[in-house]
Amino acid sequence: MSKICQITGKKAMIGNNVSHSKRRTKRTFDLNLFNKKFYYVEQDCWISLSLCANGLRIINKKGLDAALNDAVAKGFCDWKSIKVIG
C-alpha cells in the first residue's frame, strides 16, 4: 500500500531529526492514513479508500461523489484504483 491519500494526494514528507547538539539525520514524516469503507450510492456498492484525516473532512464537507470527482479530475486517483467491495 502506498502512503498517498486518494482524495487529497498528500504524500509522506522527508525531513531531519535534529538532536540537542544539532546533528541532523534524515527521517520521514508519515501521514495519518487509514483505510475507510464508504457506501457509494451512485454505483450501489461499497468502496474502500486510503485516506488521511483531511481527506475524510473533505468527504464530510463536499460529499463522496463530489470529492471523488475532484480527486479524479486533479489526478490524485483514477476509477481503476478505487477498490470496490461487493
UniProtKB/Swiss-Prot annotation:
GO CC annotation, single: ribosome
GO biological process: translation
Pfam families recorded: Ribosomal_L28
One GO MF term: structural constituent of ribosome
SUPFAM superfamilies: L28p-like
Keyword Ribonucleoprotein: yes
UniProt keyword annotations, A-Z: Ribonucleoprotein, Ribosomal protein
InterPro entries associated with the record: Ribosomal_bL28, Ribosomal_bL28/bL31-like_sf, Ribosomal_bL28_bact-type, Ribosomal_bL28_sf
NCBIfam families referenced in this protein's UniProt entry, alphabetically: L28 (TIGR00009)
Family statement drawn from the similarity comment of this UniProt entry: Belongs to the bacterial ribosomal protein bL28 family.
Protein name: Large ribosomal subunit protein bL28
Organism: Bacteroides thetaiotaomicron (strain ATCC 29148 / DSM 2079 / JCM 5827 / CCUG 10774 / NCTC 10582 / VPI-5482 / E50)
